[in-house]
Curated annotation (Swiss-Prot):
Species this protein is from: Synechocystis sp. (strain ATCC 27184 / PCC 6803 / Kazusa)
Active-site annotation: E46
Entry protein name: Uncharacterized isomerase slr1019
Cystine bridges: none
GO molecular function, one term: isomerase activity
Length: 306
């Protein structure tokens, strides 16, 4: 059997920027084991397999695999796959359209934004609003994990804390971008400190303007490390940025629609831009949205024998 696939760069408008993604747009007939082996063979952060929907309201069903395991939800695969499907199976007419994507976390609404008939970007709305639980390890231990001094970690209002919109992340705010660039991640410390914990993906953050609190910044820099998923460092992490919406929301007092740009991937030479929107009212958070652009890179076939 031959299965067609495409590769894209996600959360960028530049070839060879952003986060690479492989998508199999017609994955019917593949077993769970084959999907996992294919994801390990391609060895991107994630590989997506598209299947027919199983609900009345779903447009497509996505299965998302890292080199090590399947995920309930992931941002850059959702954003990039929707972009690809918008090219392969465009809506008619070519106007802004929202599809419902079936993922293990639930139905994920994704909006395809068109401008003058051209697909510009895609934007997901999380199926699961941010949740938080578990206390974070001490700042002393986290400084050791990152190869930093403890005074390079923020404390107080912006202390480390874990959130999830389907995939948990431990957020560690640092004092500035210089500290972020100096990270020397220690996998051995991670193994002893976080392996097997609810949030074992580590997302480090730095304010664009260190004179302002993280939630008051419009620009936030980030780096994400996920040894448990087989990802040493990720160039762009949509599910992490979605969960970040919960971290920032808990530190915001003003209702309304709040927007941030998250820049990630610089340390890997793959700069990425992710747009985060949090909508809240007097009762709390109402919606979290993550948007970005994608670039189609290549297409090919994988031969799996008879």
């Amino acid at each position: 059997m031959r299965y067609g696939f495409y590769t894209l760069d996600v959360f960028t408008d530049q070839l060879f920027g952003g986060n690479p993604l492989a998508v199999f747009p017609d994955a019917e007939g593949l077993t769970d084991g084959q999907m996992q082996k294919i994801a390990a063979e391609i060895n991107y952060s994630e590989t997506v397999f598209v299947l027919p929907p199983v609900t009345e309201t779903g447009n497509f069903r996505l299965r998302i695999f890292t080199p090590k395991r399947e995920l309930d939800f992931a941002g850059h695969p959702t954003i990039g796959t929707t972009y690809l499907l918008g090219l392969l199976q465009p809506p008619s007419p070519l106007v802004t359209t929202t599809w419902q994507l079936e993922e293990p976390v639930g139905l994920v609404p994704v909006t395809l934004h068109y401008k003058q008939g051209q697909l510009v970007q895609t934007e997901l709305t999380v199926a699961q609003l941010p949740q938080t639980k578990d206390s974070a390890p001490s700042c002393e231990d986290l400084a050791l994990l990152l190869g930093l001094s403890i005074d390079q970690l923020q404390q107080g209002e912006y202390e480390p804390q874990a959130y999830s919109c389907g995939l948990p992340f431990l957020f560690i705010p640092l004092i500035n971008e210089e500290a972020l660039n100096r990270i020397s991640f220690n996998p051995s410390v991670w193994q002893n400190l976080l392996a097997g914990q609810w949030a074992d993906c580590v997302y480090c953050l730095a304010p664009g303007d260190p004179s302002l609190g993280l939630s008051d910044n419009k620009l936030i820099h980030g780096r994400m490390f996920a040894p448990g998923l087989g990802i040493a460092e990720d160039p762009a992490t949509g599910s992490g940025v979605a969960a970040l919406g919960g971290y920032l929301d808990d530190r915001l007092d003003t209702p309304g629609s709040h927007h941030w740009q998250i820049e990630q991937g610089k340390a890997l030479g793959r700069p990425s831009q992710l747009q985060l929107t949090v909508v809240k009212d007097g009762q709390g958070i109402r919606a979290v949205k993550v948007a970005g652009r994608s670039v189609l890179v290549s297409e090919g076939f994988m031969n799996l024998g008879n």
